[in-house]
Amino acid sequence: MNDTLLTLILIVIKLGLVLGTVLTLAAYMVLAERKILGRMQMRYGPNRVGWGGMLQPLADLIKLLCKEDLIPQRADRWVFMLAPAISTITALLAFAVIPFGAPLQLFDRSLPMVICDLNIGLLYLFALSSLAVYGVALGGWASHSKYALLGGLRAMAQMISYELAMGLAIVPVVMTARSFSLTAIVEAQQSLPNMLRHPLAFFIFLVAIMAESKRTPFDMPEAENELVAGFHTEYSGMRFGMFFVGEYLNLIVLGSMLTVLFLGGWYGPLLPGICWFLIKVLGVAFFFIWVRGTMPRLRYDQLMAFGWKILVPLGLLNILVTAAWLIWRG
């Protein structure tokens, strides 16, 4: 078997394993969130379908598939149908460059634990996060509903604003690792994670990805008491389900980005690297759920002021301090 064919087979196998794992993880993350929030609110959460509610994601899938798929009469039909797919597909494509562990030795060759190890993997992730805005904005615009349109506009303004802060937060990481490759960035943290090396950048990035996820306290695009359900007000059936799955896939992507850039990736004692990676990503997801259950929603003016007046200046200051430190160190 020639090398090209073997490489292609390995890529297909890795693609299938990654997609199957992240889709299953996203489904059960919904269940975990409902269980955790139930306990925080002194409720049981879902516990009827299967042992302890373990089959609840399957029941939810069947329910969404059986619901009528309605399209508003005055909606832009094709854009309305395309928007949920954009949100889901951009989240799935992001997993192509995320390294889940150290390379394995298989068939006398090194097998990277990543579908495609790009030299510009970090730029690829940011490009996809920018494209994800279109799914939300187009979904709100195409619905021909004032509530959906306002939700879409809010989401677009929020995501663009906090993407700037997120981009500024990763500059010190790139300066330290001297590479846009996610694998190289993880390997640069073998002795010390970037969370300790760049604590201010870690704080900025953490807040920015919380805003990118559109979850409490940054859930202005879906503020129920103001906008019914925000940008997906007019969606039903599996199209609503695609937005829902896309949200949790995006949560896993953002947790993976935080793990790779600041938490040391797969590095950790005793356990295999992929186990440490999963533990860190799930820890970030639990933090997001905990914040959702305990924090109130910000006002829209507070949200935008915090992004532009606090995070962006802090990000610029952090870049200058990091550059001065690197020059002084030589």
Swiss-Prot record:
The chain crosses the membrane at residues 5-25, 78-98, 120-140, 155-175, 191-211, 243-263, 271-291, 308-328. Keywords: Cell inner membrane, Cell membrane, Membrane, NAD, Quinone, Translocase, Transmembrane, Transmembrane helix, Ubiquinone. One of its GO terms (cellular component) is plasma membrane. It catalyses: a quinone + NADH + 5 H(+)(in) = a quinol + NAD(+) + 4 H(+)(out). GO terms for biological process: aerobic respiration. It is a multi-pass membrane protein. Its main location: membrane. GO terms for molecular function: NADH dehydrogenase activity; oxidoreductase activity, acting on NAD(P)H, quinone or similar compound as acceptor; quinone binding. InterPro entries: NADH_UbQ_OxRdtase_su1/FPO, NADH_UbQ_OxRdtase_su1_CS. It is an enzyme of class 7 (translocase). It is found in: Cell inner membrane. Its EC number is 7.1.1.-. Belongs to the complex I subunit 1 family. NDH-1 is composed of 14 different subunits. Subunits NuoA, H, J, K, L, M, N constitute the membrane sector of the complex. NDH-1 shuttles electrons from NADH, via FMN and iron-sulfur (Fe-S) centers, to quinones in the respiratory chain. The immediate electron acceptor for the enzyme in this species is believed to be ubiquinone. Couples the redox reaction to proton translocation (for every two electrons transferred, four hydrogen ions are translocated across the cytoplasmic membrane), and thus conserves the redox energy in a proton gradient. This subunit may bind ubiquinone. This is NADH-quinone oxidoreductase subunit H. It comes from Syntrophotalea carbinolica (strain DSM 2380 / NBRC 103641 / GraBd1) (Pelobacter carbinolicus). The gene is nuoH.
